[in-house]
Amino acid sequence: SSAASDVYKRQAINSACKGIKSVGLCHSVQGTAEMLAKDLNEKIEDIDYLCAGINHMAFYKKFTKKNGNGGEDLYPKLKKLADDIVSDKITSTRSIGKDSESDKVLHEKVRYEILKRFGYFVTESSEHFAEYVPWFIKQNRQDLIDQYKIPIEEYIDRCENNIKLWDDLEKDMTPIHNQPLKRGKDYASYIMDAVTNNNEVTINGNVMNDGYIDNLPSNCCVEVPCLINSNGNQPQKTGRLPEHLAALMRTNINVQILTAEAALTNKKEHIYHAAMLDPLTGANLSIDEIYAMVDRLI
């Protein structure tokens, strides 16, 4: 299933292989925080947040503006923004112009709808998050896809454009000659700096759930704040998630655990089980159709 995050599968397999130190990385937490800051016309430097969950389905338990007095809760403003974005009165700042990789306008109605219904903002983009739940992409429901402005096959366009970019660079590297080096926003360089030079940093990393989120399974991979320094990676306990958020995550955790189980045990039947339990797949296909789809894929 396209919905099951690959980060969990890799972490589960790594945890089964003793002696491998690893942390799963994704840029959706910091990227979404920056988008929300822009949508609120705030500076990201003034934002403080606490985000926890699973990869591509983590939620901001706290999203505040620093003010020296405990912080201003920005969720009331975000919820007002959600009403305006879902009703097409305004768009997210992410939707201004076409995406540089897929060449499509990427709307954020899905995530703001989720904020309205669940009360918290999720980390993964609308076009991808719609693949994790059964409510937005349905066969013979073009009206829903149009309503939420979901760019179907956007990732295929993104990959094709990136492949063309790499092919062009292979033929001619002059466009990137003398290109200035600039540190990106992904975590890897900050982790190396923290471990090597003890320049302490907190990231959101993916680790097996060793008590870090109380109401998610212990054999799942969670995305939580991680303190990194010369002592290595120290994931932080975040307590319990709101039960409705944990319930939503478990629908995808089921798929992730079974997919990893198939790889670890070499039992093909668990791939069918994972596909049958995938929320979007189950909302669109019968059991026979799911089995046939899996057979075509493998």
Predicted feature residues:
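An acidic- and aromatic-residue-enriched active-site/binding cleft used to recognize and process polar
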Residues: 5, 27-28, 52-54
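Generic structural marker for isolated residues within well-ordered, non-membrane alpha-helices
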Residues: 10, 33, 294
